[in-house]
Structures are given as structure tokens and as C-alpha cells.
Amino acid sequence: MDAIQKLNDAIAKVAGGNDLYDTYKETWQYLLESYIGGEEYRRANHLVRYQLETEPEYQARLRTTPLENHCASVISVYNSFLFRTEPKRDLGSIENLAETYDFMRDADFDGRSLDNFMKDVATWTSVFGHAWVVVSKPNINATTRGDEVEAGVRPYLSVLTPLVVLDWNWSRSPSGRYQLNYFKYLEDVNKDVHTVKEWTNDVITTTVIDMGEETITDTIIEPNGLGKIPAVCVYNKKGVVKSIGISDIADIADAQRFIYNATSEIDQSIRLDSHPSLVKTPETNAGIGAGSIIHMPENLDPGLKPYILEFSGASVDKILGAIQHQVSNIDKMANTGAVRATESRVMSGIAMETEFQLLNAKLSEKADQLELAEEQIWKLFCEYMGYAWNGDIDYPGSFNIRDTGSEIAQLKTAAETSPNDPQIQKGIAIKVAEWMELEYDEDEVMPTTTPEDRPVHMQEMIMGGYEDAQILALHPEVTQNDINNARTALLTNQGE
């Protein structure tokens, strides 16, 4: 009995998490279900169960209730802006290493490039608030770097969600910097067989546990040649507790669950309106379907004749209004109202600009955290390769989020207000050309046209492929009417 108890204690120690893990585990699981959606969300039973509702009825309601996955939508919007422009990397002394080239193309030995890997890291940090990246290098007891190159050995990355990082501990170095001195995570799960890896500054311990048989089947201990734990905690936004970040969807997930339950209520309301309940005595024989016949006993009391049970719950319109209110709240929390809008919304120019600025600030903060994390990753990469990191990583710090349709409408109004002012027309033309991403030299000098030679010159520029915006920018004295007249004359001449 003592031996069995000792074994159970050993398994619990190896496979168990620390207090922070136990505290946040359910929250992390809920956030993961909210992001993934689909069958995972359905199995989590996030629908509120009715009183006296049987299990088959509840399961049927789960199967017929769709999920509007706002969590995934918001994170997708963030990532689309974050990685629209690739980060700039100056890798310094390791720029031309073959290992660096391979690492950039296949960062995790699973075919993902470093950019794609960092995009996954950004996704999981948005979901959980933080994620861990482990930089590993296989130990093959190579004596020279040539042996490692021949064997294809180089550092690679692994991203770990908080749900698999079971235990960790920080300590302060003499310089005051925090450093990990213990790190334990669940490396692999194959049915009942769990593989747990523990890192210290000196050794790496890999333990294989058969949870079904409750036995430890294998333990591998190897030296940690790096002398430190190569794990990087990547934050979405730092929280008050070290190693615990703030999720982007913590509050959005609750609103999404409300919408999920409200959608179920709409389904039930429609079903009750279309197929109301019939109250009758056991002796009354009622058919099923439209126009069915009801047979009542001849001696039935008139007060017991069948009748329809009227449904008096909340109307569908009221529930839809509540859902729309929650969608609006989600957009406010995520600062994505103007970006995720699927229909025209009444927003003033100042309100829209303010929302764009708030979204830009949020994205800039996320980009700064990714930039900091990638620099730490490259430092560990260099330590494995025997180099000192002297490079620089630069993620975009500002994101061009604009309502171009509104801007073009404003420019059109301005052009119609002052059609004969060449300076205003030129400024408008330049703005339109920027929006259209036209390439031309604004400082290019063009001879000023006269009313006599202007039509011919306009026709030459049109034939040369110049856009209207380019012509207006290069010739302040020209108006849009001049260009239209030249184009009309050109078409007439070609027709003749």
C-alpha cells in the first residue's frame, strides 16, 4: 500500500500543475472553447439548461443552436492588420548562416516559416493573454559544428499554450533580472500515455506516464548544455501577476455566450409559434400535422374540449434587439466597430477616427510584445550557435487604418465646391492618387499649357496612359472638364 501511494504521489507531482495553473485552468479552457467554437463549444454545454429539461431534449437543443464566433472574428481582424506588413529583421552576424536560412523557412520543423509561426503565437496570446515559446536544439553529442550541420541539427521553436505549461518558477539574478529556474510542460499526449518534460538550469528530465495503468514507464535525464531554460513568455498584454497575461477575448467570450443562448431562445420561440402545444384529455384522439382531425368522446364535458396553449414569451424582435446590442458591445470592447461592420452604421467622422486610433494603439501594443519576444528568441538562437546577438527586429509600429470611402466622398465634395481653383484641384488629385496607390513624381515639372495647346496635350497624356489624378497633379491649371473634353474629342476622332 505504501509503494502504491508513493507511486500515485510521484505521478501527481510530475503531472500536476502549480497553484496559478490550477486557478486559471478553467478560464483558459473556456477561452479556448470560445475561440475554436464548433463541436468543442457544443460539447462544453454552454447553453443554459431549462428546469425539468431532459438530457435528450438538451442535446437536441445543442445540435440545433448555431454559434456566432465573434472571438475568432476579432482575433482574425487583429492578425490581418498585424501581419499585413512583414517585420524587418537585421540579423547581424548570423545573417548568412545556413542554419539561419533554414530556421527562417522552417522554424518549428513542421514546415512553418518564422512569419507563420509568429502569427500562430500572436493568435494564442490573443486567446489566452500569453503563450510560451521554447527554443530547443537536439543533443546528438556532436564534437564539431560540421557534425551538427551534416546531421541537420539546429535550433527550432515550439509554441506552448498555458493549458500545457503545468509549472514554472522565477528567480532574480544578482543583476536584478528575472530568470526561469524551473519549467514543466506537457510535451505529448497519446491516448493514456502522457509525456512531461521538466527543465532546470542543469538538467532536462523527460517522464513518460501511462495514466490508464497509473505507472511511470520511462524517465530520461540529460544535461542542459545551454545552462539556462530557453523558454520565452510572450504576452498579449501584461497583467498584474507575472506569467499571466490579459486576453483579448475574456469579456467578448461572455457576450458571445449570451448571444449563443439568445439564439437558442429564438429557435424555441419560432418552434412554439409554428407548433403550439395542444391541451387535451387522454381519451381525445388528435392527429398530427396541418388540417388533422381531432376525435373527441361523445360524452366529453364541454369544459374539457381541446385547446391551443398560447405562447406568451419574449418576441423574436426583442431577442434580436438584445443580440444586436451585444454585437455592438463586442465591437466597442474590441475597437472593431468600423472594421467588422457588415452594414452601414451611423458614425460621425470624429467617432470613426477615434475608433481607428484606439484600434491602432491596441495593435501597436501587440506588435511591441511580439517584437520583444522575437528578439529574445533570436538571442537564444545565437547562444545555441555560439554567437552574440547584434541584430535588430522591427515590427510595424503604426497601422494605416482608414475609411477610404468616406475620404473619397469628402474629396469629391471639396472638388465640386471649388472646381476652378487649381491648388485645391491639385491637392485633391494627389490625395486620390495616394488612395489609388499610383506611382508618379509629384515634383515632376510639366510645361504650363495654354488654352490653345491644352486639348492636344491632354489627348497626348491620355494616350500615354496617364490617369486623371496624375494629369491634375502635374498640371494645376487644368480642370477635370478640360480632361473630359479632351477625352471626348479623342474618342470622336478615333470614331471618324
Language-model features, listed with the residues they occupy:
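Short amphipathic alpha-helical segments
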Residues: F109-S113, F117, T125, D251, ...
